[in-house]
């Protein structure tokens, strides 16, 4: 099991290019077949565009399970339904699984 602590990319996560850059920065440290968890602790804000880019790249890379750890972060809770509605793929499935546990 691997945990990605998003706080290592900053407290304010904005823009599609920054999301892509964040994923590219950690790709070489990840094992694609292992469970990957995403931790939102200490992140103040994440925009749908940043998270869409990051999670899309992660979902495409991973052959295992990707899960989102529970959070009370309002920006995360607002961004996720937007992404889940806009997509019909592995990213939407990851988000729907998280939202069903709320």
Which positions does each model-derived feature cover?
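Residues at alpha-helix caps and immediate loop-helix transition turns in enzyme cores, especially N-
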Residues: 18, 50-51
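STAS-like cytosolic regulatory interaction modules
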Residues: 1-44, 56-102
């Amino acid at each position: 099991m691997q945990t990605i602590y998003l706080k290592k990319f900053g407290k304010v996560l904005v823009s599609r290019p920054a999301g892509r850059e964040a994923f590219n920065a950690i790709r070489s440290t990840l094992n694609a077949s292992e469970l990957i968890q995403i931790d939102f602790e200490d992140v103040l804000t994440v925009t749908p565009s940043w998270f869409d880019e990051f999670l899309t790249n992660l979902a495409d890379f991973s052959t295992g399970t990707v899960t989102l750890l529970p959070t009370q972060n309002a920006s995360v809770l607002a961004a996720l339904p937007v992404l889940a509605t806009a997509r019909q793929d592995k990213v939407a499935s990851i988000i729907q699984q998280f939202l069903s546990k709320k």
